[in-house]
Amino acid sequence: DSQESVKDKLCHTTSMNNRLEFQEVPAHFDALAEIFQHVSKYTRSLNTCDWREVEDLTLDNVWMNVQHANQPIGHHTHEEANYAFVIYVRNTLTDPTIGHTYEDRSVNDPVDGMIEWRYGETHYLSPNRMLHFPEERDIVVFPGWLEHQVYPFKQEGADRISVAGNINTI
């Protein structure tokens, strides 16, 4: 499975500051090629007439996030990049949405450990956010300008590890 190989190839290559250090080794090139394939597929889903081939993409930077209980990642964008990606390498959290019935995107809906993307303005009957509970091996690609955040979770002893990065077009 491609996500599994990306996880295996990238998980143990961090520096002390959680920046991933790509080296000129086949495993790293293979992992990067798989990430680029996902980004290319994403661009094709946006615009079937003007999408980006793998050869049109370049890696700007990549890092690892290690998140423990009560640690949020606040609202931010990656405006310096055309595209951003996240690969969820490890997630020991329990999905807070299990058994929950959503009612008109209520403020009471569970958000523990979820990533939230915000788009557009808030208007009556016009949702402007998307919540996603990431599972291990999820690969998520989105525009760099899209505002997002990661909610903290309260589950003690749980952790989540993700590899994230920015990609630009050549």
Where are these regions (language model features)?
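Non-heme Fe(II)/2-oxoglutarate
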Residues: 1-53, 70-73
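Hydrophobic, well-structured mid-protein blocks that either form specific transmembrane helices
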Residues: 49-50, 54-62, 85
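Beta-sandwich strand segments
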Residues: 50, 153-154
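Catalytic core of non-heme Fe(II) oxygenases with the double-stranded beta-helix
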Residues: 61-141, 151, 158-159
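Active-site-flanking beta-strand signature of metal-NTP-handling nucleotidyl enzymes
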Residues: 84, 164-165
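Double-stranded beta-helix
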Residues: 166-170
